[in-house]
Amino acid sequence: MDNPWSGRVSLLVNDVERPMALTLGALAELEVTLGDDTLVALVERFETGAFSSGDVLSLIVAGLRGGGWSVTRSELLSADIAGGPMGAARVAAQLLARAFLLPEERRA
């Protein structure tokens, strides 16, 4: 079960619940993946609903790696993610929000 105050969420991948966190290392890897793009631009795309499936996948990979699973992007391409693309997008948005909100601003 997730603790919204910890900044962590979980995702069911291939029927296994996986913890996710945007640790400093995971954020650094995400920045490399984004290339010329920025974390600020990624957050803005999620806030406005203008994110892409690539944004969701990059965020999911970073979160899973930050949660301790050494998964690759290519491994997730064929994985069964609970809720499908919409479920993945919802969890990615929760992860992003929890990573950047102060504890007193977080909502369950």
Tell where the protein language model's regions lie, with residue ranges.
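Extended acidic/charged loop-beta regions that coordinate divalent cations
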Residues: 60
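A short, sequence-level motif marking secondary-structure junctions
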Residues: 22-28
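Charged interaction scaffolds used for protein-protein
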Residues: 1-12, 17, 32, 37-50, ...
